[in-house]
Amino acid sequence: MSETHLSTQKFADFPLHKEVHQALNEAGFEFCTPIQALSLPILLEKKDIAGQAQTGTGKTLAFLVATFNHLLSTPIPAERQLNQPRAIIMAPTRELAIQIAKDANLLAKHTGLKVGIVYGGEGYEVQRKVLDKGVDILIGTTGRIIDYVRQGVINVSCIQAVVLDEADRMFDLGFIKDIRFLFRRMPDAKSRLNMLFSATLSMKVQELAYDHMNEPEKVEIAPNEKTSKNIKEEIFYPSMEEKMPLLLSLLEEDWPEKAIVFSNTKHSCEKVWSWLEGDGHRAGLLTGDVPQKKRLRILEQFTKGDIDILVATDVAARGLHISDVSHVYNYDLPDDCEDYVHRIGRTGRAGQKGVSVSFACEEYALNLPAIESYIQHSIPVTSYDSDALLDDIPPPVRIHRKPSTHTRNTRDRSSGRPQGGQRNGPRRHDKTRRHS
């Protein structure tokens, strides 16, 4: 993390349990981020918070530290049964729940507290067997949690700490009735520690907080800055015919370490993926109908660097928490202004620099004024030289083919860039495509 992202507040200065301090030290966490520095003093006094912070600001560690410390500081209810977790952390997507669980296990190893994770789409019986052994901290998506509650597999009447992460996305995905269902079955709000985090503290999010929390204090990090200063934004105005050549040319010119390409529809994502695969890129495709096991496999490949570019719709990408994404490409400008913020927030995380490139084509250019009004600044326009776009682009692959694994897809940075795919002719590097 860069110094600009961190505060001067050290974790060591907080009165945390020694087991929590030990885990933080072993994980390399010394200084707090702003959201951690502001929220932890409140939470350690056992007061509720409703926190607003951009994605990638460290809010996950903030509520995990508070949750672990609270459970270690609070007596276990005498009547607690094996199927009653002491804390529950609700997330809008499987991927976010999985990431939270990974971070939680880092903090758990010296505490003796058991972490369990549940989510829909797979592993119902496997997850149930874990719950049958008892967990202290339950992390998961609301639908699967409710399934287990209704079947009596778990009981939430001994909950001592609650976290609702990405509450605004919970509303977007229609999960609020599920959340209220669970809250009504928990102890009174005054007898538990309640934490809510959201990218935006809209009126509906604040209403949820005040309905189910105990006079939460509002914590805001740069609420007027919708996008991170660590992200360099630019926008191009390509014709429909030049969108794909421009994308492929910029990918070669930028040579991103790890990139996400967003498009507005499943069909468009499949088209983009087909061209990327045909041009020799190691690309993964995430749309709403990708099976869960394949989805997790693609995300694991992307995280490990076996895939360099992820092509995704907004629905499929919600809740993704992947580090070191260097570039985000908006092949289509989103129809929803908040989706623009969430998209580019995949890069420039944890103090790192990021790049956001958007295309304002004939079909979606009308979305730009609303987006710029929402983010409260104009996106710098970049022109390009049409004659400098790649003209040796191989044809796209068929969508039913599995991503190829032969040497054409091996991006060996030591020996230069791919040489024109199937044509094997050197691409032009004598002309820059960007003109300020």
UniProtKB/Swiss-Prot annotation:
- Residues forming the Helicase ATP-binding domain are 40-219
Q: What is this protein called?
A: ATP-dependent RNA helicase RhlB
Motif span (Q motif)?
9-37
Q: Could you tell me which species this protein originates from?
A: Shewanella pealeana (strain ATCC 700345 / ANG-SQ1)
Alphabetized HAMAP family for the sequence = DEAD_helicase_RhlB
Q: Where is this motif: DEAD box?
A: 165-168
- NCBIfam families hit by this protein: PRK04837.1
Query: Where is the major localization of this protein?
Result: cytoplasm
